[in-house]
């Protein structure tokens, strides 16, 4: 499969497997974010029958938050994760095969069939900064405060018109006079989508996983 118009973010809620790409393989498991740049030919090989993914598409690249990076693109010390937490593909031997290889390509919101005469993973090496990667949510080190902090403090990724936040287990609002959770309010600047993958959320009650 190749998405020729959008970058993709896959969050693994259930299941394990391997993300196979023309630049190498990434093993994934529960809690992994998979970032797949547009134009990447890939295949998901699943190891289990029960697999649940949260799937997002972006017409702009998906980055780490700008405020966590210096002018050279390096993650700063106050970032909730660092470069060592990001895993890149493991190189595999090229598939020197000929035949009819069907590639599903998404373009202009349609799926097109392309037949390759050689295996799309017939690659002997790659160079540059264009590759898929993974980051596990359990490596996200939350930033906490004695009083309530706004949701952007949990930001993990950003694109042109949306952000992705990771609300993980943490101490929160531990000042003796702090309001323990935000009171009823209206967010007129942003639409919010919450995906429950584990545990309970501080400001919502009686919600089950994947609600």
Predicted regions, residues:
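Jelly-roll (double-stranded beta-helix
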Residues: 1-211
